[in-house]
C-alpha cells in the first residue's frame, strides 16, 4: 500500500509561519531552531502514520513524499526507513515556469533529488513523475542510474479551470478518468525493454481490464486511487477477481507468463507505439 504523499510545500509553509510569528529581531540560531521544529512537527505526524500502517497490515507499506528540491529530505528519508517503511516513493512534481531554465538542468534536479535520498537509505526508491519530457527513455535511464529502482507512470497534476463569473481559477476533474490511462500504457510498453527496473502504471486505472492491459504492456504493478474513491475499497477485490478469471481463461498460472507480452519489444505490431501509426490513424496511410 502506498501512503498519501507528504508535500514539501506543507512543511515549508509551516516553517515560514513559525518564522514570521517569531520576533523580527530573533537571532539566527532561533530561526534555525524554529525551522527544525516546524519540520519536526509535520514530519512526526507522517512518521506516526507509517508506524500505524505497519501495525495494521501485513503487506509492504510504501511512504511517499512530494518533493521539489533535495535539501529537505537528506535526514528525513532515514527517519522514514527507521520507522519501518518498506520503500519510498519520490513524487517529483516540477512545473517549470522560467523560459531561461535549461531542460537539462530540470532533469539534473530530478536526478539530484533521487541521488541524495538514495544515498541516505537502503530501502528501494521509486520516482513518480509526469509525462512531459522530451525523451522519456533518456530521463528514465538517468533516474535509474541515480538510484531509482522503479518508475511510477504518471503523476497526475492539478487540473485547473477558470470560473468565468468569479474570474478565479478552480479545480476541475478531481478524479482521473479511464481515458487517461493511455499515457502510461504507451510509456510502460516502450520502457519495458530498456529501463531495467519496476514500472508502475498509474492514472486512469479503474477496473480489472485496465490492470490486465498494464501488465500486458509490461507493468510490474499498478497504483489505484480515484476508482477507490468512486467505487469504494471493494473495487480492489472486484479487480483482482477479474484478473484471476482472465488468467484462467487464457491459460496463465503466473503473471510473469504474460507480463510485457504486448510491450514494444514483444508486440506483433511494434509500430503501434511509433509515429507511423499516428499518421495511419489520421490519414489512413498504410
Predicted regions and their residues:
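Short leucine-rich amphipathic alpha-helical surface patches
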Residues: 219, 226, 243-247
Amino acid at each position: 500500500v502506498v501512503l498519501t504523499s507528504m508535500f514539501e510545500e506543507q512543511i515549508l509553509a509551516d516553517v515560514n509561519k513559525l518564522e514570521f510569528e517569531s520576533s523580527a529581531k530573533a537571532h539566527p540560531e532561533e530561526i534555525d531552531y524554529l525551522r527544525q521544529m516546524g519540520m519536526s512537527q509535520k514530519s512526526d505526524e507522517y512518521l506516526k502514520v507509517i508506524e500505524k500502517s505497519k501495525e495494521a497490515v501485513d503487506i509492504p507499506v510504501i511512504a511517499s513524499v512530494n518533493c521539489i528540491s533535495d535539501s529537505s529530505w537528506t535526514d528525513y528519508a532515514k527517519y522514514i526507513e527507521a520507522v519501518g517503511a518498506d520503500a519510498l516513493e519520490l513524487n517529483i512534481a516540477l512545473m517549470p515556469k522560467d523560459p531561461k531554465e535549461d531542460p537539462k538542468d530540470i532533469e539534473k534536479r530530478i536526478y539530484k533529488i533521487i541521488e541524495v535520498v538514495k544515498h541516505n537509505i537502503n530501502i528501494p526508491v521509486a520516482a513518480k513523475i509526469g509525462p512531459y519530457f522530451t525523451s522519456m527513455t533518456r530521463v528514465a535511464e538517468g533516474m535509474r542510474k541515480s538510484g531509482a529502482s522503479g518508475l511510477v507512470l504518471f503523476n497526475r497534476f492539478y487540473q485547473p479551470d477558470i470560473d468565468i463569473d468569479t474570474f478565479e481559477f478552480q479545480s476541475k476533474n478531481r478524479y482521473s478518468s479511464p481515458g487517461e490511462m493511455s499515457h502510461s500504457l504507451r510509456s510502460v510498453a516502450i520502457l519495458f525493454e530498456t529501463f531495467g527496473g519496476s514500472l508502475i502504471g498509474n492514472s486512469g486505472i479503474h477496473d480489472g481490464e485496465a490492470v490486465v492491459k498494464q501488465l500486458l504492456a509490461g507493468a510490474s504493478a499498478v497504483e489505484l486511487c480515484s476508482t477507490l474513491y468512486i467505487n469504494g475499497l471493494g473495487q480492489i477485490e472486484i479487480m483482482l477477481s477479474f484478473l484471476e478469471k482472465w488468467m484462467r481463461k487464457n491459460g496463465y498460472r503466473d503473471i510473469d507468463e504474460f507480463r510485457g507480452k504486448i510491450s514494444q519489444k514483444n508486440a506483433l505490431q511494434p509500430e503501434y507505439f511509433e509515429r507511423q501509426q499516428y499518421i495511419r490513424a489520421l490519414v489512413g496511410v498504410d
